């Protein structure tokens, strides 16, 4: 049996302000730092050790991972960072308030943009400073691969090949793996692992900063999965994620 640990980054400053973030590189909030520390302490308490870690190219995921590894006393392990684990790109919605956007376009429309499988938000023009072609961290990535907007289907199309080619390979070699990423890149991975339908993934709420453990068989099929921590706290965190994008 293999184990895989997934962690959505701790609350970011834009999570706190209820803004669409996507590929915008924002820092963790104070609460997010505390969530990452708690995640590290939970993993330490349960005796977790890791050989290799994976993360995105965004600070909030990197910082969450670094804090967790520091709490574990495992900052020395190899870390691979890739744009393929970045959050889903929210196009022209990036930087907008979710509740205000719901008031303007309607909750149903915003829910479709946020959670539908194959409907992306309005795209960013390449002249927009928010477009990834303007960001030096992506200068070595072919321009045609950099999104102007994404739906979950698009996110899956970049996450799953990386899972197959890189992450799964390390697990099958017997390495203990932790992945620190984002709500939608992790939803993409969970959909694949659990073979969720497009309808079921719409209802999937992954809370910030709470370790999600997968136990996998020899073929990397899930045996079971579970969150570490207090059940009531986990439930409230999931409800908080589900409530984003609603009128308040």
Swiss-Prot record:
Keywords, ordered alphabetically: Gluconeogenesis, Glycolysis, Isomerase
Gene Ontology biological process: gluconeogenesis; glycolytic process
Site (Transition state stabilizer): 182
Record EC number: 5.4.2.11
Any matching Pfam family: His_Phos_1
UniProt catalytic activity: (2R)-2-phosphoglycerate = (2R)-3-phosphoglycerate
UniProt keyword Isomerase present: yes
Active-site residue numbers: 9 (tele-phosphohistidine intermediate), 87 (proton donor/acceptor)
Pathway(s) where this gene product acts: Carbohydrate degradation; glycolysis; pyruvate from D-glyceraldehyde 3-phosphate: step 3/5
GO molecular function, one term: phosphoglycerate mutase activity
Task performed by this protein: Catalyzes the interconversion of 2-phosphoglycerate and 3-phosphoglycerate.
NCBIfam families attached to this UniProt entry: pgm_1, PRK14115.1
Family of the protein in this entry: Belongs to the phosphoglycerate mutase family. BPG-dependent PGAM subfamily.
Protein name: 2,3-bisphosphoglycerate-dependent phosphoglycerate mutase
Organism: Borreliella afzelii (strain PKo)
Top-level taxonomy: Bacteria, Pseudomonadati, Spirochaetota, Spirochaetia, Spirochaetales
Gene name in the database record: gpmA
């Amino acid at each position: 049996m293999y184990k895989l640990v997934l962690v959505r980054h701790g609350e970011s400053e834009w999570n706190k302000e209820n803004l669409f973030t996507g590929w915008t590189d924002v820092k963790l909030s104070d609460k997010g730092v505390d969530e990452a520390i708690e995640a590290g302490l939970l993993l330490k308490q349960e005796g977790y050790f890791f050989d290799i870690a994976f993360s995105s190219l965004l600070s909030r995921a990197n910082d969450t991972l670094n804090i967790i590894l520091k709490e574990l006393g495992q900052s020395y392990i190899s870390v691979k960072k890739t744009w393929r684990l970045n959050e889903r790109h929210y196009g022209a919605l990036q930087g907008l308030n979710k509740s205000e956007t719901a008031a303007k376009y309607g909750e149903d429309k915003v829910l479709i943009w946020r959670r539908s499988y194959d409907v992306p938000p309005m795209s960013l023009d390449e002249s927009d400073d928010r477009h990834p072609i303007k960001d030096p961290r992506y200068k070595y990535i072919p321009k045609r691969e950099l999104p102007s907007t994404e739906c979950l289907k698009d996110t899956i199309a970049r996450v799953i090949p990386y899972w197959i080619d890189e992450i799964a390979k390390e697990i099958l070699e017997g390495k203990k793996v932790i992945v620190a990423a984002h709500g939608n890149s992790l939803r993409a991975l969970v959909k694949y692992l659990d073979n969720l339908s497009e309808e079921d993934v719409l209802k999937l709420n992954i809370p910030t900063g709470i370790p999600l453990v997968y136990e996998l068989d020899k073929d990397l099929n899930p045996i079971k999965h579970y969150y570490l921590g207090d059940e009531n706290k986990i439930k409230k965190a999931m409800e908080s994620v589900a409530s984003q994008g609603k009128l308040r």
